[in-house]
Every structure is written in structure tokens, then in C-alpha cells.
Amino acid sequence: MLKKSLESILTSEESDELISAFDQIGNIIIVRIPDALLSKKKIIGETLLNQVKIVKSVFYQSSAVEGDFRTRNLEILAGEDNTETEYKEFNCKFIVDVENAFFSPRLSTERERIAKLTQDGEVIVNMFAGVGMFSIMAAKKKKCTVYSIDLNPIASKLCERNIAINKLAGEIISINGDASKIIQDQLMDKSDRTLTLLPERSDEFLDSAINTTKSGGIIHYYSHIHADKKSEAGKLTEEHYKKITSVKSEILGSKIVRAVGPRYYQTVVDVKITK
């Protein structure tokens, strides 16, 4: 139905491209529109608003996610100019601000994977936690303690709100600030499991991840990797990690998290470190 509606204003190829380039987050749609179609952005927005039942707002993403606070610029195309919504995933509820704090629905499979790996009694340091989605999913059913850190004050406040609206088996401590400084001051050798969810800058923060992780603990090291063959991306990530790490590491596994561009992937390598 949506494709047919879009094809009333676009070609079949253009509508296919557009459908693959939008995210629905709660009652908000965010769409990335190719330059060639920008002249039709308003009618695209109205069509999406009318065809997707629960949607109240359609935004055009006019910039990449950027800056230390990991925010993006959004332009309202149709509906209410409100960037805050409620999003549900795996029996958890989240209040998100899609413009002013980092959030991606395309990481849901990875969030579920980390939650399943988490064990009762673990201490987890989530170095770039955003609104707390990985943290909350880990603490939903497991009696763990999560230090949920983010530099963006809006993200940290949303994390606190999300902690309050979810019934958790574990405990989450939301901390606003620079992860490296917080680790140095408060969280040295504290973590059984550490997440480095800033793939474009993980190399800069690897030493901090090592510093917070206990000997025998696990680091989930996320990065962006170029690979001519998709099947090689995980192996290339492992090789990259080995090249830059300063600690004895056992590779437990690696995988593609998602594609982020042509021959360009967000990947993760899981490593057990020994100090």
C-alpha cells in the first residue's frame, strides 16, 4: 500500500529507494531523501503521514549524525513538529528525542545479543550509552549493575527517564560526562563487560575501555570497516583490533552489526582481556 501510494508521485525505483531510507520510531518517521527528489519532499512527507497509521510527524534528515553529542538536523515535512516520542523494543519502553540525542532502531538485533550475553552479577560499563537502550535491555532481566555514560546532557536525562519507566531486575547508574575522565576517576578495573558504542572513534577510547575492564573481562569493540567482500568484514575487524590493542586478548568472535555505506560496515569484535 505504501509503495503504491509513493508510486503515484515517484517512479517504482525512486519509491523503493525511499522506502529503504526511512526509519519509523514510535509515531515519527525520519526519511533520508536523495538530492534528485528534494523538490518533492513536502508531498513525500504528506504521503507518508497519510499512509502510515500511527505516525504523527514526518521529518527529513538534513544532516548526518555528528558532533560530540551525536545529534542530527531534522526538517519537519508533515504533521507535528515534535522530535520526542516513545519507542518500544523487546518489552522495554524508551522515550527518545530523535534530533537531540543519539538513537538508532537499526541496532535492535545487537542490543538483544548483548542482553542475552549479560550474566547476573556482572558490572557493565556502557561508555557511549545515548538514551540508555543497551543498558536497560541488559538490566531488564539480569541482576547486573550498569554504568551508563554519555557526554550529551539531554541523552543522560532521557536515560534517567527511561530507567524510571522500566521495571528492571538490575541497577543502572546514569552518568553525564566524558567517558575517559569518568573511568579514570571512578571506574578503573570495575567492569566485567564493556561496550564501546562509538564505532567511528573507538580507537581513541580503546585504552579507556581496557582501563575500566577487569582482567578476565570482556570488551565489545565496535568499529567501522571497509571491506570489498562482506564476508571479510569480521576478520578485518579482528585484525584491526589486534594491531591497535595494548593488552593480551582472546578473540571470542566478530560480526557485522549493520551496513553503513557501500562496502562499509559497522562491526563488533568480542574480546576477553588478561592484564
Ranges and model annotations:
Residues 1-275:
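SAM-dependent transferase fold signal centered on methyltransferase-like domains
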